[in-house]
Amino acid sequence: MKFARTCIAVAAIIGPGSFAGQATPQPSQSEIDSADRLFQMGKFAEAGKLYSQIVIQNSKDYSATLQLGRIALLSNRLDDAQKWLEKAIALKPDDADAKVMLAEVFYRRDDFQKAAASLNGVEVSSNKLLISQYPSLNVANLESFKGQTPYELHGNGTSTRLKFVKTEPLPVVSVRVNGGDEVTFFIDTGGSEVALDTEFAKELGVPQFGAIQGTFSGGQHAEVQQGRIESLTVGDWTIKNLPVAMLPLRQLSKGFGVKQIDGIIGTTLFYHFLTTMDYPRGELVLRRKTVESLEQFKKSPGKKVAVPIWMASDHFMVGWGRVETLPPTLLFVDTGLMGAGVKLAESVIKEAGIKLEENKASEGAGGGGKLKIVPYTVHHVSFGDIKEENVPGLYDGPFPWENMFGFHLAGMVGHDFFKPYAVTFDFQNMQIFLQ
């Protein structure tokens, strides 16, 4: 803003005739390798079954226990994730990865004090997992919310609607920060926490709690400050006590065709609601995150196609899709991919035989600076059961998330892919509805 093709079935070692007093066989290396391979392929449920078998055979297997916690976190099954990660910490108290992921469990529950406490003993300035995947776990920022409820909702009714100021090149909306005048934000699920332009944040006097290196299009990096705001007003609702990121955004205003871009609404805000980006109607809909809201939505008119998703890192929504005639693969849902419907890793472009149109290359801007953008066309792209043909794609350099999460990501689906639909994000059951 890892790609194995084969699946090895492993037979259970313990047969029904095992003697009660017999020592439990230890998991074989082939079982462990098979589970790891399934995880790398993105087959999380299948991998989880094998890791569970391994833990039954050896309850002290740290790696399998940690992976069960990781898979539960990907699936947003937070109680299960907490159980397995706490077991992993008990097995290896000095290993930081389980503590970092446990902190993310509490972060997703908006229990910022427990999230900060979970990072006790972790070298937060150098921990690779925290820096690369969970940068929002800033201890000073989290601790600043003591005595407050993060993302506290103030407003009446079961939903609020906010018209897009414009839909192209990305949806843009008017919001208020800290009760001030209306300002212009764009919507981008490729982003995590609400983001503010650096200068706008200075004008507001936003407190700062340090900086991280953000990763953006083309593998570029830029410094991102971390802070907090008192409130964000979206439609008729006001959300109080929000962590925010800060980076230069006003430089993007011309590309959006607006006077001034002051911020971004990303996935973390969406996560707190049953959220719809309704492209055909040109509006953002936030509904309370309740069972009743979901049931009411499901009963509303219109055919809905549900696509299961997982959430890696602090905001990477991924789901199964296909590119050309290649086998099914995981794709990242990045509605902030501008001017294209898909962006693929270079390895996938080559494997699919996709031709880059170098004669149509242009210069563009990303969160990390200027980029050379080369277009291409993908004849067939699917996401879940939604299939589209002749989808515009773009290449702007390395795809830094291809192997970052321990499983293979082929690329991302973006604005042009989703704009025919109303896209609803259900984080309670981890699915996206397209209608």
Model-predicted segments: where are they?
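Bacterial N-terminal signal peptides that target proteins for export
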Residues: 1-8
